[in-house]
């Protein structure tokens, strides 16, 4: 029964993230169609009307970016609050019960993701990938089925997608450590989902508008990114479901390590130091209705309230 729940939750994560990631693709296609329609009717439409349509499109894009920026700041607050108020306290409790070292586990979780992040950054910077799509151009879903190897090659060659794929795996591992704690699982799941929504929206927008990738390649990359967290979650959950003394000890220490990894994710996003987020950043290009600290604090307050509700139970 637990295994079925793991598969259903992983499927939900995959489908939800994938569908949300397709929204910018649909939105941009719709805007392009609108521009083409305006250009075709340019002879019969006044310059004033054309300029008005262009201004409307620009306003829509600006509004879209503001919403992503607000959601991104809110997600940072959720991750920060979840790390400090829920995952780390529960991890310390589990770690002490299994005679683990609190400081070492936190440090391993934090530095583990940091080192992995740096290795990915160094690898892609040395490679200096240039997007020359000479190999296979995906024109339809049939091309995707016929060339599965090219899908992974595109992932590895795309610096931003590859870095976010690795980051998604670490999120899934953090989620998998909470399999045996339902209340904590729900809160961590919500925090990760809210964190992934602006990431996948920005990723799709980046691939379409800046990298000029073809539609089906964008869809493939979005699907791979969407699958990263479910993969990490399923692997750790399956290990967690085997109730052996060794696995109990490992899971007890892994929960605190996952707290360290979540702390790294929230900290780097909070201070703007996450290297692969620079290309995805939209906050620097838009003016938010309120200061960004307002949205971060709102995000922090939700795990704070939930932590008191859980402690009362």
From Swiss-Prot:
GO terms for biological process: intracellular manganese ion homeostasis; zinc ion transmembrane transport. It is found in: Golgi apparatus membrane. Residues 24-67, 125-154, 205-217, 273-285 are cytoplasmic. One of its GO terms (cellular component) is membrane. It is a multi-pass membrane protein. InterPro entries: ZIP (IPR003689), ZIP9 (IPR045891). Residues 1-2, 89-103, 176-183, 239-251, 307-313 are lumenal. The keyword Transmembrane applies. This is Metal homeostasis factor ATX2.
């Amino acid at each position: 029964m637990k295994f079925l729940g793991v598969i259903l939750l992983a499927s939900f994560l995959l489908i939800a993230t994938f569908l949300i990631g397709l929204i910018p693709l649909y939105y941009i296609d719709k805007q392009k169609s609108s521009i083409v329609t305006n250009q075709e009717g340019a002879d019969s439409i006044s310059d004033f009307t054309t300029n008005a349509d262009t201004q409307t499109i620009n306003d829509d894009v600006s509004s879209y970016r503001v919403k992503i920026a607000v959601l991104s700041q809110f997600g940072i607050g959720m991750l920060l609050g979840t790390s400090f108020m829920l995952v780390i306290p529960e991890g310390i409790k589990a770690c002490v019960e299994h005679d683990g070292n609190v400081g070492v586990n936190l440090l391993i979780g934090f530095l583990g993701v940091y080192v992995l992040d740096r290795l990915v950054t160094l690898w892609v910077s040395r490679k200096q990938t240039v997007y020359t799509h000479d190999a296979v151009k995906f024109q339809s879903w049939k091309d995707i089925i016929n060339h599965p190897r090219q899908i992974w090659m595109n992932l590895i060659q795309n610096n931003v997608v590859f870095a976010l794929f690795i980051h998604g795996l670490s999120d899934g591992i953090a989620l998998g450590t909470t399999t045996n704690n339902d209340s904590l699982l729900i809160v961590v799941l919500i925090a990760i989902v809210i964190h992934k929504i602006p990431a996948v929206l920005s990723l799709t927008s980046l691939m379409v508008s800046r990298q000029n990738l073809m539609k089906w390649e964008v869809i493939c990359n979005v699907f791979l990114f969407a699958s990263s967290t479910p993969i990490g979650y399923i692997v750790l959950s399956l290990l967690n479901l085997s109730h052996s003394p060794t696995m109990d000890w490992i899971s007890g220490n892994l929960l605190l390590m996952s707290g360290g990894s979540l702390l790294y994710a929230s900290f780097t996003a909070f201070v703007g130091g996450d290297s692969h987020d620079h290309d995805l950043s939209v906050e620097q290009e838009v003016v938010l209705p309120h200061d960004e600290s307002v949205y971060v604090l709102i995000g922090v307050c939700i795990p704070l309230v939930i932590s008191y509700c859980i402690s009362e139970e």
